[in-house]
Amino acid sequence: MQAYAVRDAAAVPARLSGFELVEGRVAETATVRKRTYLNFGADWRSDFTVSLAPKARKLFEAEGIDPLSYRGKLVRVRGWLKSYNGPLIEATHPEQIEVIEE
């Protein structure tokens, strides 16, 4: 089924919406105004991004995961895709992000 296919983070259409599985290498990580971002391309304004609110970040930390440590890793992300400075998934729980390759 194409609807459940894993999408390449570099090729996710900006206007796509719905529940998606997206896989790619995290190019950069940053925390800005208490929100953490995992950027998958050179331009965060247009490339795929995962966002973690402060409440979600606390859940990751409770599991012993520093979200900033995803930098450089190949990951698969599950969640509702929306358009905000390019395609974005807001991760609310650590189980949404699976490390495929260190």
What kind of feature is each model-predicted range?
Residues 1-102:
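OB-fold single-stranded nucleic acid-binding module
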